[in-house]
Amino acid sequence: MIWNSKTLSIALGIEISNSVNCNEVQFNSKDVKKGDLFIALQGNRDGHDYIQDAIDKGATAVIVSKQVEINDKDKIILVNNSFEALQKMALYKRENSKAKFIAITGSVGKTSTKEALKILLQHDFIVFASRGNFNNYLGLLINLASMADDTEYAIFELGMNHQGEISELVQILKPNIAMINNISEAHLEFFHSLEEIAEAKCEIFKNFSKNDIAIINASNNCYNKILSILKNLSITNIYSFGHSSKASAKLILYKTLGEQVHLQYYINNKFIDITIPFIPRHFANNYTGVLLIIDILGKDIEISAKYLADIALTKGRGKIINIQNSRVICDYYNASPQSMKAALEYLKQVPADNKTSIIGEMLELGWNSQRLHEELVPYILDAGCTKVYLVGAYTKYIYDLLPNKISKKFFKNVEELITHITDLFEYSELILIKGSRGVKLDKIVDYYQ
């Protein structure tokens, strides 16, 4: 159990007379499982309207901030403010935890890096990893409040699209190890330059103690900028990974072997060779930082590296699925210029006679949008696409630059594509689906499956 009457009473500073034993904390009644604690938050919707639904799904306790009329009154915990109660629960967990806390941020690859580190550590330790990509302030509170007391390693991804957001998160999280996975042109709608994004990401190192460890990508354009910020913060315990000769860790060999890939890593003066089921090169690059953390923690890196074979690509994040007669690379969870180029490189690597790209526009790029979309054209051509379907306003710039020898079509939205292209998966093809989440390219897969 994650919470009981005693620990909840201490965390909330109130007397709880009812017997309470709960697992995870949920604020969305749709996510409630048997044994969970439901907290009624007020936002665009009032969580108090969903209390009975949460109880019907198995919630053993419900935190509310106003009187409600339900049958299971013994499950109600009344507080002055539900959100403040959640904050108190999160702070209680952090202050009383003996776990080592690891925080990961970056423009792309946060979730896959976090999940990979979790898989490598959980063979020998009790590991908690924040759920999905729930990486904002509310997500941090819910995740911390759902962490078991016996956790040995806690891994959190931290997201942001404005200055000051990560600073607010680390004031609570206080990570012992913090990594910036990469800096790229994401969220440029809210920033004027990559340097500004780097400054915002470097907030992850605020509140560092003397022995805390910073891990950065030496391949970043902003590498020297980040080093300067770390120097100003008086942080000296720094490790790096990437392609740079300065890096403590790097991927030095990536060789495809049919359905497998052979990888060689250099990690802190050690060479690691592994052969695992095929993964795209950008995933292999991300795992460099993961292996570096494993080595810093003093774990057996050769044994841990073998567990990379246990990592499976997921739907929406690069997994290949079959629809009718086609193989489909489902990479529509999100998109930035860097991840879009990486996905097209992935498409290039996978052998197929006929290749099709369905490219959704990349959102939140601000005044750089036209240029960053146009820069994808050579990657599309290099991937060997015979058909290209473009979805969303800014992909019109790609359409205009693609040569006429390629079969190309532009659609204002995904619904228009689904309506007009009725034979999408009928032929034996390899199809990449990639775009920002807001374009909703997942509807294509849902419609045809």
From Swiss-Prot:
Pfam families: Mur_ligase, Mur_ligase_C, Mur_ligase_M. Its main location: cytoplasm. GO terms for molecular function: ATP binding; UDP-N-acetylmuramoyl-tripeptide-D-alanyl-D-alanine ligase activity; UDP-N-acetylmuramoylalanyl-D-glutamyl-2,6-diaminopimelate-D-alanyl-D-alanine ligase activity. Its EC number is 6.3.2.10. The keyword Cell inner membrane does not apply. One of its GO terms (cellular component) is cytoplasm. It is found in: Cytoplasm. Pathway: Cell wall biogenesis; peptidoglycan biosynthesis. GO terms for biological process: cell division; cell wall organization; peptidoglycan biosynthetic process; regulation of cell shape. ATP binds at residues 106-112. SUPFAM superfamilies: MurD-like peptide ligases, catalytic domain, MurD-like peptide ligases, peptide-binding domain, MurE/MurF N-terminal domain. It comes from the Bacteria. It catalyses: D-alanyl-D-alanine + UDP-N-acetyl-alpha-D-muramoyl-L-alanyl-gamma-D-glutamyl-meso-2,6-diaminopimelate + ATP = UDP-N-acetyl-alpha-D-muramoyl-L-alanyl-gamma-D-glutamyl-meso-2,6-diaminopimeloyl-D-alanyl-D-alanine + ADP + phosphate + H(+). Coiled coil: none annotated. Keywords: ATP-binding, Cell cycle, Cell division, Cell shape, Cell wall biogenesis/degradation, Cytoplasm, Ligase, Nucleotide-binding, Peptidoglycan synthesis. InterPro entries: Mur-like_cat_sf (IPR036565), Mur_ligase_C (IPR004101), Mur_ligase_C_dom_sf (IPR036615), Mur_ligase_cen (IPR013221), Mur_ligase_N (IPR000713), MurCDEF_CellWall_CoF430Synth (IPR051046), MurE/MurF_N (IPR035911), UDP-N-AcMur_synth (IPR005863). Involved in cell wall formation. Catalyzes the final step in the synthesis of UDP-N-acetylmuramoyl-pentapeptide, the precursor of murein. PANTHER family: UDP-N-ACETYLMURAMOYL-TRIPEPTIDE--D-ALANYL-D-ALANINE LIGASE (PTHR43024:SF1). Belongs to the MurCDEF family. MurF subfamily. This is UDP-N-acetylmuramoyl-tripeptide--D-alanyl-D-alanine ligase. It comes from Rickettsia prowazekii (strain Madrid E). The lineage of its organism: Bacteria, Pseudomonadati, Pseudomonadota, Alphaproteobacteria, Rickettsiales. The gene is murF.
